[in-house]
């Protein structure tokens, strides 16, 4: 699961709207939260900690999701490069 899906899932489990989360974080528009949940941008690390508090989840769980997504992305990129190089030889 990537961070965007994780954030949306946890917000819904907390019973909060995007607008309510934005307001708790001090944003004037829910568009920030929407963008995070659609993977268009990522919240700053300090904001992730606040989100964890608002959703009553462990910040470590959130960072583990981010780490796994990064590892998966790097693995996919390296695999693609490996196969491209193998085809040219």
Regions found by a protein language model. Name each.
Residues 53, 63-89:
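Short, charged recognition helix plus adjacent turn
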